[in-house]
Design a protein with these regions (language model features):
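N-terminal secretory signal peptides that target proteins for export/translocation
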Residues: 1-11
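Bacterial N-terminal signal peptides
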Residues: 15-27
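Solvent-exposed helix-loop boundary motif
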Residues: 28-118, 126-190, 207-212, 222-230, ...
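Primarily the internal scaffold of c-type cytochrome electron-transfer domains
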Residues: 61-68, 130, 136-171, 279-281, ...
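Short, well-ordered beta-strand segments
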Residues: 119-124, 778
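Primarily short, surface-exposed interaction patches in extracytoplasmic proteins
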Residues: 176-251, 265-313, 374, 418-424, ...
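Globin-like tetrapyrrole-binding proteins
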Residues: 931
């Protein structure tokens, strides 16, 4: 070792050595090309064995040895030694063939790992004959396949977990002093403090209480006048009356609606590579806000979202609520042609439903029995059966008569247009055929051969090559079926391209060109197009609609651009006998759910036994509830399964639903829940800090008609909520350093959305326009680089974009920077809680963001206007607006000195630049803007104290 150089192997460095070594190894192997099975096996073990190993062999594929890889699974050998480009395993991990592997949530292979795998295959895929098959990831051996699976018996002992028992209601314990003995919440909290030897903090001052309440319930600042009025009001009900005013405010739903939108993974774009805009998602957001403002009973709130269309008397609200299913992440490709997406969507819905409403993680049971909670793999598929009938459906929010008239008129116009479009297609057909043939001639020979080979005679490699070119092409029904080239024509309409643009087309660079027609044909086509345009004007405006769901059969969705038939068998042979959307009087059967099905191979899926719908066994003790509650309506066909599930979840007998919701409300008030893991009440979650209080609140929630606002009243009127946050007691800190038992009010930082809102509230420039389509916050063009997919309207900072943050557009592929740096959650899954980080980018955002600088100046203008020309009065008003209190003498003195110093600097700069006419008022405004900027960056401003 060189003199003067030493290694410091402390704990903070040793942990990284394995990762550094692994990175060096991967890079070296990838570069040198000397690859053996010792390099490949760890990659397979980490990324593949969970689904293709000892305990689980999805698609009958086992990757634990060379022989097994060569044997392959349902789609044939996974490996062609010496030819990575022809090997299915390589195509899948690189995304050349869908679905790309490994499936989420397992991360994609790194570039180095892909390079190692490719080199290994190209070198012949050598494998040490003496090397043992790598042990698979942990799991129950019984879960290897449906033929070997034996469902775990749920015992009474498993049901004894506290969260699976119905809440018991104990009388609140007697405590002293008297002010702690009037609210049951205080009685439980104080009894625990007494038992732990903790001393409660005194009550916070009134200025702190009003600011805390306003930020908590509305996410807005109280005005200086409201602060003064409350502080000077000595009436006994002053505080209670303030809470009632806030609960009655429309801004309450805007604040608390954002929390619920986290739970249901709400966003307004589909995510993934296309990230399409969900045009009516904002209606669901408005439904949530309205429901909270109306104090809709929580049990009805649950039922409407899961089965609003299946209610006996559905309303616009209940139909809008079914967008719960549609606001999650979705790919662009259709489920009927890509069944594995159907199962991914089912997993998303199961995860969101059980995690959001019941605090359970069921997704682990997709591949094996839950490792910690008594939830079996069969439970998972039973639960899937309760949802499996749903299909996407746009509900018209108009009277039925009006909807029927619109549909009839539209159908008639489209009937008249159809022959005109067919005539255009006949005119274009020979030109398209010629263009297609010319395009094919320019392709590589292997692609030409693949396209010309009849579909049923293509090899797996030819299918891949042909698909990369043919995706998005339509089949001409009038063409000669014996001529493979003639029966494939390029899609003619721009709207087809809009709805379906295959990624393979962009990747391979195959481009469609405009057709060059003869003058006569061009004239004829134009006449037909003009006729179509005139007819289209007769189509009435589409009535107001919302993207929701109803029951149907996803396998029979109408054909569209890019659709392909099910492989091997007809839909009828697969048991599909009904239709996409059943009409009144028509027999309807929910598609069967087969145990272990994943949509990757339909024939293999159907070998699994049909699973009957049902509920989680651990929560059903005795006679189970009915699995179907069809709507009592003659004009609507539905299975009633989703309604049965919704009513079971929303039942007072369900031990989890009420507990989970009151715990969420508690968490959103205090920054931590009575159960610190609000999305996991299972054995991997934390135990409740105050179990008797949690059960009392859950039973009271039900007794009060599932009223969320009533729980707010109880919490906010408690002494527990009104305690000071700055209280210090050495004994308390020693016994309970993290304030688990709430001996003082827990300080917490506001979310990014609330910070933006209170900045606008401080400057008095907030736009209170409520509801309707979302606005696009101004984002620098530099941030938008690389996010070309989907929509983000370019805007500037102006009143139209100064609406409350809950109404801003939420795009999965591009987060708004201010929200993102302040821990905006992942919108692809239910967010049980928000992470709270403290990182430099947060301070840098508030210091340098154009929006914050602009609002700082507007705040300074407000202060100057309302306080007059008295500088001390301006500083005092600034404090009152921003943090609801007067400055201390020292703060006032320091701030006046700061402003005067800034004015001197501004005046000197004006003199140096020759700006003699620079107004004194402008210099002072600039100086006050600096102080306002400091205030907006202070902890006291962005925290609830």
């Amino acid at each position: 070792m060189r003199p003067g150089f030493s290694w410091n192997f402390n704990g903070g460095a040793l942990w990284a050595l394995p990762f550094i070594a692994a990175a060096i190894t991967l890079t070296t192997v990838a570069q040198t090309g000397a690859v053996t099975d010792k390099d490949v096996r760890p990659i397979l073990e980490k990324n593949c064995f969970q689904c293709h190993g000892e305990n689980l062999k999805m698609a009958n594929l086992d990757l634990r040895s060379r022989e097994l890889i060569l044997k392959g699974g349902n789609t044939g050998p996974a490996l062609v030694p010496g030819h990575a480009a022809e090997s299915l395993i390589y195509k899948r991990v690189t995304g050349q063939q869908t679905p790309k592997m490994p499936l989420a949530p397992v991360p994609a292979l790194t570039e180095s790992e892909v390079a190692i795998l490719k080199n290994w295959i190209d070198q012949g895929a050598k494998w040490d004959a003496g090397a043992p098959a790598v042990t698979s990831v942990s799991g129950d051996k019984a879960n290897a396949s449906y033929s070997e699976y034996k469902e775990r018996v749920i015992t009474d002992e498993m049901r004894h977990w506290w969260a699976f028992q119905k809440p018991s209601r104990l009388n609140p314990p007697a405590v002293t002093p008297a002010r702690w003995s009037t609210n049951p919440i205080d009685m439980f909290i104080k009894a625990t403090m007494d038992a732990k030897g903790l001393t409660p903090a005194p009550q916070a001052d009134r200025a702190t209480l009003i600011r805390r309440a306003y930020l908590d319930l509305t996410g807005l600042l109280p005005s200086p006048a409201e602060v003064d009025a409350f502080v000077s009001d000595s009436s006994p009900r002053a505080y209670e009356d303030m809470i009632e005013r806030l609960l009655a405010s429309s801004h309450y739903g805007e604040r608390w609606g954002r929390f619920w939108l986290d739970v249901v993974r709400f966003a307004e774009s589909s995510g993934y590579e296309h990230d399409r805009t969900l045009n009516t998602a904002w209606r669901y957001r408005d439904y949530v806000i309205k429901s909270l403002n109306d104090d809709k009973p929580y049990n009805r709130f649950v039922i409407e979202q899961l089965a609003g269309d299946e209610m006996d008397k559905p309303t616009d609200d209940s139909l809008i609520a079914t967008a719960f299913y549609r606001v999650g992440p979705r790919v662009r490709f259709r489920e009927k042609d890509n069944p594995y997406y159907r199962y991914d969507y089912m997993d998303d819905i199961l995860r969101t439903t059980f995690g959001g409403f019941m605090g359970l993680s069921v997704q682990c049971a997709r591949c094996h029995d839950h490792k910690f909670d008594p939830i079996t793999r069969m439970d998972y598929y039973r639960s899937m059966g309760m949802f499996f009938g749903y299909v996407n459906y746009d509900h018209l929010l108009v009277p039925k008569k009006e909807a029927d008239e619109w549909a009839a008129t539209t159908r008639e116009v489209l009937r008249q247009i159809a022959p005109l479009k067919k005539e255009i297609a006949q005119i274009e057909a020979p030109y398209k055929r010629k263009q297609f043939e010319e395009t094919v001639k320019k392709l590589p020979e292997d692609v030409q051969l693949a396209i010309k080979t009849p579909v049923d005679e293509r090899t797996s490699g030819q299918k891949l090559l042909a698909a990369q070119f043919e995706s998005g092409l339509d089949v001409d029904p009038d063409a000669n079926a014996d001529d493979d080239l003639a029966k494939i024509v390029l899609a003619a309409t721009d709207d087809n391209f809009y709805h379906y643009t295959p990624p393979s087309e962009a990747k391979q660079g195959y481009q469609r060109r405009g057709l060059k027609l003869s003058d006569a044909d061009e004239q004829k086509r134009k006449e037909l197009q003009d006729h179509i345009a005139e007819l289209q004007k007769k189509i009435p405006k589409v009535p107001t609609a919302v993207e929701g769901v109803r029951d149907g059969d996803y396998r029979l969705a109408p054909d569209g651009p890019g659709d392909i038939p099910l492989p091997g068998k007809s839909r009828a042979e697969y048991g599909v006998k009904c239709c996409y959307l059943p009409d009144p009087g028509q027999e309807y059967k929910v598609p069967d759910v087969h145990f272990g099905a994943n949509g990757l191979n339909l024939e293999e899926d159907m070998k699994g036994p049909v699973v009957q719908p049902g509920f989680l066994q651990v929560l059903v003790n005795g006679t189970p509830p009915p699995v179907a509650v069809p709507p009592k309506r003659t004009d609507y066909v539905s299975s009633g399964r989703r309604r049965a599930l919704a009513e079971w979840i929303a039942s007072p007998d369900n031990p989890l639903t009420a507990r989970v919701m009151v715990n969420r409300i508690w968490y959103w008030h205090f920054g931590t829940g009575i159960v610190a893991t609000p999305g996991n009440f299972g054995k991997m979650g934390t135990l409740p800090s105050h179990p008797e209080l949690l059960d009392w609140l859950a039973t009271e929630f039900i007794r009060q008609g599932w009223s969320i606002k009533q729980i707010h009243r109880m919490i906010m009127n408690s002494e527990t909520y009104k305690m000071a946050s700055g209280f210090y007691n050495a004994g308390n800190v020693g016994k309970d350093p993290t304030d688990v038992y709430l001996w003082r009010y827990p300080v917490r930082r506001l979310e990014g959305e609330a910070i933006r809102d209170i900045i606008l509230s401080a400057s008095d420039k907030i736009n209170f326009q409520a509801g309707g389509p979302s606005f696009f916050p101004a984002i620098p063009l530099s941030v938008r680089v690389g996010y070309a997919n989907g929509r983000w309207d370019l805007t500037k900072e102006e009143p139209a974009t100064w609406r409350r943050s809950v109404y801003s557009y939420w795009k999965r592929g591009m987060k708004f920077p201010m929200f993102d740096v302040h821990d905006q959650p992942d919108q692809n899954m239910t967010a049980e809680r928000r992470n709270i980080s403290t990182v430099p980018t947060q301070a840098l955002m508030l210091l340098n963001d154009e929006f914050v600088l602009q609002q700082s100046r507007l705040l300074a203008e407000r202060v100057a206007h309302e306080a007059g020309s008295d500088l001390p009065a301006e500083v005092k008003l600034l404090y009152k607006i921003a943090i609801s209190r007067q400055p201390t003498e020292k703060e006032l003195r320091d701030d006046l000195e700061f402003v005067n110093h800034e004015q001197s600097i501004q005046a000197a700069q004006a003199g140096d630049s020759g700006s003699v006419g620079k107004a004194v008022e402008d210099i002072r405004l600039r100086a006050m803007s600096r102080l306002a900027h400091v205030m907006l960056n202070s902890n006291e401003f962005v925290y609830i104290n």
